[in-house]
Amino acid sequence: MGKTILTPKQLEFLELVKIEPEITKRFYLTGGTALSEFYLKHRLSEDIDLFTEEEEVDQKLIEVYLKKNSSLLSIKKIERSVFMGLMSYFLIFKDDSKLKVDFNYYPFPRIEKGLKFGKLQIDSIRDIAANKVHTIFVSPRDRDYIDLYFIMKNCNFKLDQLILDAKIKFDWHIDKLTLV
């Protein structure tokens, strides 16, 4: 895989996820970790975002999967948090380090297919860019501006095209002035 920005815990987790058919047929990796690890290598990212286009997220399936792999990953405790319908799992390892993993329904169809890591689909850089534009419009965070800057710099995407992609994907009016 070459140079990685993943922590050893993130890598171990994704190495197991990429071979689990019950997870890989439902979920894809997206967000800052996908962007940083598989496309740009520009920053560290702390969590793992696994999204599905299936309306019902099977909590039981996820919990069984996490418990089944607890000993392989040296997990001593799993905490679940639900905030505004978003489900996060906090994996607490025997060395007391933590990894946040989100398993969530994302109702917006992807623009194009991305890469694959084993059997795990990785969101395309174009989709991640459109998601970043939407996120900046709705709830800006510094890291999203940083990600968008590096996407545009390294991928020759133009802001107008990314705004159009976000408008189409999210059916939302977004203008340049709001993004700054």
Model feature map: region roles:
Residues 1-180:
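Compositionally biased terminal segments of proteins
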